[in-house]
Amino acid sequence: MESPNHTDVDPSVFFLLGIPGLEQFHLWLSLPVCGLGTATIVGNITILVVVATEPVLHKPVYLFLCMLSTIDLAASVSTVPKLLAIFWCGAGHISASACLAQMFFIHAFCMMESTVLLAMAFDRYVAICHPLRYATILTDTIIAHIGVAAVVRGSLLMLPCPFLIGRLNFCQSHVILHTYCEHMAVVKLACGDTRPNRVYGLTAALLVIGVDLFCIGLSYALSAQAVLRLSSHEARSKALGTCGSHVCVILISYTPALFSFFTHRFGHHVPVHIHILLANVYLLLPPALNPVVYGVKTKQIRKRVVRVFQSGQGMGIKASE
C-alpha cells in the first residue's frame, strides 16, 4: 500500500485516504462498490441498447431515460475506478489537476441528472394532464434542447469551483479525508479565506436541489390530482404505476444526496466515516438502481430484455446442436 507522506511536501499531489477509521474494511467495502459499478454499466448499457433498437420506445420518456443512463455511466466512470484503486491497492495519490477535473465532473454530472429528473417529471405532467398536446409540446427539437440545457446548466454551475479551489493555498496536509475529490473535503484542507468556496458551493447546491425538487414535487402533485379524477380504474392504475417508478427514482436520487449534503455542512457531530459512506451511497446507488426500477416498471423494456435473452439462449442451443 502506498504512503501519503510525500504529499506533505509535493504541492501538486493530493492523497485520497478513503474512509477514515474503516481502512481495515476497505477490501470488503470494495465488494459492494464493484457490484454496484458492474450493475451500473450492465443496466444502463442495456437501457441504451434496448431503446436504440426498439422503434416503439423512441418516445420522449425513453429518450429522457437514455439521457439519465448516459449521465449515470459517465458519473460511474468518474468515480468507481479510482475508488476501487484506493480500496484494493491504497493508490490514493492524485494530481491536483486530476483532482480538480474529478471534482468538476462528479458535481456537474449530479446537476445534469437533477435536470433530467426534472424533465422526466414534466414529461409525466404533460402526458397525464395534457395528453392531446403531448406530441406537440415534447417534440424532438424540444427534447434535444432539454438535453443541451442539462449539460450547459451542470457545466456552467460547476465551472467556478475549480477556479475557486485553484486560488487557495494548501500549506498543511494534502491528505483528503474522502474517497473522491469532493468540493468541501478539499476546501477543508486550505489555509486562508475559504468563505467564497463555502458560500458558492452551498448556493449552487441549494439552487439546483431546491428549485428542481420544488418543480418535481409540483409536477407530480398536479399529475396525481389529474390521475385521481380518471374514471377508468385501469387507466388510473397504469398512470400511477408509471409515476410510481419515477417517484422511486426521485427518492433514490435525492434522499441520500440531501442527507449527505446537510450532514456534511451542519452535522458536525456525525462521524467522518458516516459522511463519506453517505456520499458514496448517493453516487453509487442511484445509477445502479435506476435501470432496475425502470426495467421492472416498463413493460416494453422488460419484454425487449426477455426477448434478447431468449434469442441468445436459442442461438446457444443451435450452436450446441
UniProtKB/Swiss-Prot annotation:
Topology within the bilayer: Multi-pass membrane protein
Annotated TM spans: 28-48, 57-77, 102-122, 142-162, 199-219, 240-260, 276-296
GO molecular function, one term: G protein-coupled receptor activity
GO CC term (a single one): plasma membrane
UniProt keyword Glycoprotein present: yes
Cellular compartments annotated: Cell membrane
CDD domains from the UniProt entry: 7tmA_OR52P-like
A Pfam cross-reference name: 7tm_4
Keyword Transferase: no
Disulphide linkage map: 99-191
Extracellular side of membrane: 1-27, 78-101, 163-198, 261-275
Glycan attachment sites: 5
UniProt cross-references to PROSITE patterns, sorted A to Z: G_PROTEIN_RECEP_F1_1, G_PROTEIN_RECEP_F1_2
Lineage: superkingdom: Eukaryota
Cytoplasmic side: 49-56, 123-141, 220-239, 297-315
Family: Belongs to the G-protein coupled receptor 1 family.
Physiological role: Odorant receptor.
Protein name as catalogued: Olfactory receptor 52P1
Recorded name of the encoding gene: OR52P1
